[in-house]
C-alpha cells in the first residue's frame, strides 16, 4: 500500500498540526554552543519550512492557540500585578516602561526608515525582544484593524517573517549582552550582590539546600540548669541562640507543650526541633544529660506547606515582622511570580507571595491562618472559573470605542489578558476559587503558544524565500539595535537616574525582557540569587506591557504617515 504523505497531511489538519509540533519540539532541543534553540523557534522553523510546501491549517486553531496563551500569561501575572503596579514597585515599573517603550519607539523609527509595512515592523519588534506576547498582541490587533483581506494576509505573513528572522538574533544578542555588559561598567556585580546581602541580611547562596527540621529529645542536666539560671523560656530566647526551639517537655511523667513562662528543671526531658546543622551545633549544655528516646515526646508530625500571603496584617510587612520562629515554624523558600527569592528579613511581602514553611502541623496551620492560606495540594483545575473568565475576556475584547472617523477596539489579546489577571488576582485572595495547578497552567500556556507558532509559520512559509532576500540584511541590523539599545538605555536610566544597586538592576533588566536564560547568566556572574529580586519585580508587569506594545505599534503606525 502506497501512502502519499503530502495528501495525508493536507487532508487532516489535526495530524498536520501535531506533526509540526513534534518535529518542532525535537528541533527546539538542539543547541548552538551554549544556546538552546527553544520550543518556540523550533516549531516556527518547521512550520515555515512546511508552509513553503503549501501546507496549511485552519486559522481557528491559530486563534485558539494565542487566546489560551495570552489568557494564561494573565493568570500567572495576576497575583503580583497590582502590588507591583500600585505600591512598592515604582522603580521596577519605570524600568519596564523604559525597556518596552524605548524598544517600541526604536522599532517604529527603523520600520519607517527601511520602508517596511506594519507586519514586518511588529514582527521585528517581537522577535528582537524574544517576546511572543508582542507577536500575539500585534496579530490580534491587525485582525481587528479593518484592513482589506489581501492587505491583512500580507501583513500577517510579514509579521511571522519578521519574528522568525529576528528571534535568534534577539536571544543570542541578549545572552551575550548579559555575559559582557556587567564587565563594562565600573561596579563589580558580585560586590553589589554582597553589599545588598550585608544591608538586608540576605542568604546569597543560589544553591542553598533546604532541609526539613528534625526533632530530638534530651534530658536536662545540671549544666543546662546552671546555664538557664532560673530564667523562663521567653527570657532565654533559646531559638536565637541555638536555632532550635523547645516543642514539648516531660516533667514527672507528664507531657506538656510549654509556654514562654516555663522554667527548665533538673530531670526534665525536652523535645528540641531544628534543622540538622542546628542540632549539630548545640552547646554541650543541652546534651550533657543524655539523648533520650520517648515515643510520646517525639510524636510530632513535621509538615512542609506553601502558604499564600493574603491577609492585611502580612501584606506590606517585612518578612522579619512575621516572627515565624517565635511560632515554631521554619522558612525554607520565598517565591514571587514563580521566581525563588533570597531569604531576606527586610523583603516586603506582596499579596500572592508564596512562603514555604516547615514545622509542626498545628503550628504551620496557625501561621497560615494568620497571614493567608495554605495552597491547595490538588491536581483538579477549577474549569468553571477558567471558562467563565475566558468568556469575560472575549466579551471585553469586543468593546469598541468610536472617535469621529476613527474606531479603536480593545481586541481579544487585551481582553483575555485583563480577564486572566483578574482570575489570578482573585485566586491569590480566595483559596478555594479558580485553582489551577501550576503544571496544568504551564501545559495549557505552552500548548497554546506552540499551536499559535505552528499556525503563523504555516501561513507565512510560502513567502519567506522572497522576504528573506529582500529584507534579510536590514532585519539583522534592526534586530541587533532593538535587542541591545533598549537594554543600554534601561541600564543608564536605572544606574544614574534611579541609582539602583547593580545586582538588582541587572536582574530587573532581564525581567523586563522576560528572558530566563539571560537571568541565569546574571546570577552566575553575581554568584548569588540576589538578582532574582529584581527579575521578579519587573517580570509580571513586563509581560503585560509587551502585550500592550504589540497592540500599540499597530494603532500608532497609520498616524506616522
Swiss-Prot record:
Residues covered by the RCK C-terminal domain: 200-288, 292-373
One BP term from GO: potassium ion transport
TM stretches of this protein: 8-28, 32-52, 66-86, 94-114, 158-178, 383-403, 406-426, 447-467, 475-495, 540-560
Molecular function as annotated in GO: monoatomic cation transmembrane transporter activity
Top-level taxonomic group: Bacteria
Keywords assigned by UniProt, alphabetized: Cell membrane, Membrane, Repeat, Transmembrane, Transmembrane helix, Transport
Keyword Repeat (UniProt): yes
Coiled-coil ranges from the UniProt annotation: none
Protein name: Putative transport protein CKO_02260
Source organism of the structure: Citrobacter koseri (strain ATCC BAA-895 / CDC 4225-83 / SGSC4696)
Amino acid at each position: 500500500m502506497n501512502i502519499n504523505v503530502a495528501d495525508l497531511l493536507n487532508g487532516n489538519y489535526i495530524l498536520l498540526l501535531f506533526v509540526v509540533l513534534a518535529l518542532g519540539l525535537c528541533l527546539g532541543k538542539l543547541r548552538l554552543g551554549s544556546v538552546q534553540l527553544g520550543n518556540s523557534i523550533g516549531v516556527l522553523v518547521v512550520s515555515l519550512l512546511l508552509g513553503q510546501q503549501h501546507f496549511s491549517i485552519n486559522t481557528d486553531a491559530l486563534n485558539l492557540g494565542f487566546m489560551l496563551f495570552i489568557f494564561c500569561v494573565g493568570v500567572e501575572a495576576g497575583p503580583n500585578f497590582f502590588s507591583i503596579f500600585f505600591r512598592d514597585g515604582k522603580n521596577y515599573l519605570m524600568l519596564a516602561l523604559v525597556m518596552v517603550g524605548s524598544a517600541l519607539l526604536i522599532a517604529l523609527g527603523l520600520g519607517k526608515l527601511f520602508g517596511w509595512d506594519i507586519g514586518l515592523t511588529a514582527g521585528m519588534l517581537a522577535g528582537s525582544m524574544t517576546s511572543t506576547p508582542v507577536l500575539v498582541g500585534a496579530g490580534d490587533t491587525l485582525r481587528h484593524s479593518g484592513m482589506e483581506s489581501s492587505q491583512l494576509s500580507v501583513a500577517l505573513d510579514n509579521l511571522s517573517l519578521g519574528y522568525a528572522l529576528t528571534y535568534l538574533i534577539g536571544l543570542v544578542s541578549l545572552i551575550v549582552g548579559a555575559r559582557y555588559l556587567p564587565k563594562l561598567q565600573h561596579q563589580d556585580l558580585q560586590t553589589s550582590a554582597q553589599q545588598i546581602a550585608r544591608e538586608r541580611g540576605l542568604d546569597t547562596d543560589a544553591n542553598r539546600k533546604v532541609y526539613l527540621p528534625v526533632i530530638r529529645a534530651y534530658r536536662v542536666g545540671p549544666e543546662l540548669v546552671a546555664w538557664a539560671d532560673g530564667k523562663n523560656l521567653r527570657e532565654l530566647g533559646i531559638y536565637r541562640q541555638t536555632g532550635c526551639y523547645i516543642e514539648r517537655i516531660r516533667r514527672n511523667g507528664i507531657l506538656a507543650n510549654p509556654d514562654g513562662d516555663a522554667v527548665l528543671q533538673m530531670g526534665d526531658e525536652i523535645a528540641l526541633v531544628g534543622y540538622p546543622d542546628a542540632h549539630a551545633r548545640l552547646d554541650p549544655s543541652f546534651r550533657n544529660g543524655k539523648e533520650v528516646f520517648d515515643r510520646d515526646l517525639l510524636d510530632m508530625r513535621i509538615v512542609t506547606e506553601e502558604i499564600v500571603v493574603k491577609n492585611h496584617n502580612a501584606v506590606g510587612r517585612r518578612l522579619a515582622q512575621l516572627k515565624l520562629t517565635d511560632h515554631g515554624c521554619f522558612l525554607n523558600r520565598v517565591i514571587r511570580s514563580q521566581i525563588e527569592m533570597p531569604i531576606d528579613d527586610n523583603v516586603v511581602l506582596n499579596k500572592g507571595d508564596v512562603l514555604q514553611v516547615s514545622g509542626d502541623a498545628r503550628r504551620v496551620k496557625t501561621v497560615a491562618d494568620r497571614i493567608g492560606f495554605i495552597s491547595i495540594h490538588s491536581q483538579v483545575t477549577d474549569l468553571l472559573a477558567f471558562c467563565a473568565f475566558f468568556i469575560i475576556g472575549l466579551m471585553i475584547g469586543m468593546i469598541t470605542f468610536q472617535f469621529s472617523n476613527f474606531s479603536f477596539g480593545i481586541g481579544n489579546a487585551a481582553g483575555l489578558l485583563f480577564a486572566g489577571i483578574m482570575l489570578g488576582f482573585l485566586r491569590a485572595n480566595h483559596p478555594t476559587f479558580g485553582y489551577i495547578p501550576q503544571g496544568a497552567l504551564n501545559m495549557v500556556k505552552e500548548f497554546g503558544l506552540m499551536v499559535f507558532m505552528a499556525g503563523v509559520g504555516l501561513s507565512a512559509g510560502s513567502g519567506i524565500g522572497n522576504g528573506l532576500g529582500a529584507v534579510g540584511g536590514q532585519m539583522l541590523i534592526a534586530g541587533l539595535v532593538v535587542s541591545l539599545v533598549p537594554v543600554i538605555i534601561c541600564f543608564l536610566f536605572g544606574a544614574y537616574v534611579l541609582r539602583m544597586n547593580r545586582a538588582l538592576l541587572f536582574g530587573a533588566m532581564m525581567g523586563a525582557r522576560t528572558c530566563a536564560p539571560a537571568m541565569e547568566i546574571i546570577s552566575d556572574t553575581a554568584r548569588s540569587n540576589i538578582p532574582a529580586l529584581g527579575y521578579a519585580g519587573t517580570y509580571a508587569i513586563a509581560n503585560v506591557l509587551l502585550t500592550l506594545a504589540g497592540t500599540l505599534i499597530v494603532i500608532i503606525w497609520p498616524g506616522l504617515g
